[in-house]
Amino acid sequence: NALNEVSDNTHIIPYDVKDELCGEVDNPEDLAVMSERLEQVKAKKVYVCFSTDILHSGHLNILRRAARLGHLIVGVMSDEAVASYKRFPLVPCEERKAMFKSIKGVWQVVEQDTLSYKDIIEKYHPDVIVHGDNWKEGFQKPFRDEVIELLSAYGGKLVEFPYSSDPKYKEVDARSRLELSLPDNRTT
């Protein structure tokens, strides 16, 4: 499965996940044991959070990759949480939640009220949290450190995907900032 993470052009389905499924099936009892192990792997809860209101293919790629890891819970930052560190969202939180609910592979959508993941981790106890690797430094680093500490208390894992630096995503962001800055779009 590591090759799937390196290249989106492959689709290899693993029969063993970190030795959690390895075993011989010689009789019905073995099959029952292996089936139970498979269900445990599939039942893992995976959490990923978004503040975006402009969904692009990079976001969909993260969702697709995260969904491979288990039941995908998508957190949508509240309007207030988003506005606390960047502009007020163009699309209200309830609409953004509806948008994510309609995406294949999303198991549940919840609202995240703060930049901290603490309340989410305590409430949902995810086995895996997925995030872009862009929070290793800067203002998000303390939140990352908190996530690592909270997950380590019960054996949860943080999976960080490389943050996309594709120019087309930067263009979408720049275009939306430009449109928002035009006098016709400003209100007093």
Q: What positions do the PLM features span?
A:
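Nucleotidyltransferase catalytic core that binds NTPs
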Residues: 36-188
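Conserved alpha/beta core of the MobA/IspD/sugar-nucleotide pyrophosphorylase nucleotidyltransferase superfamily
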Residues: 1-42
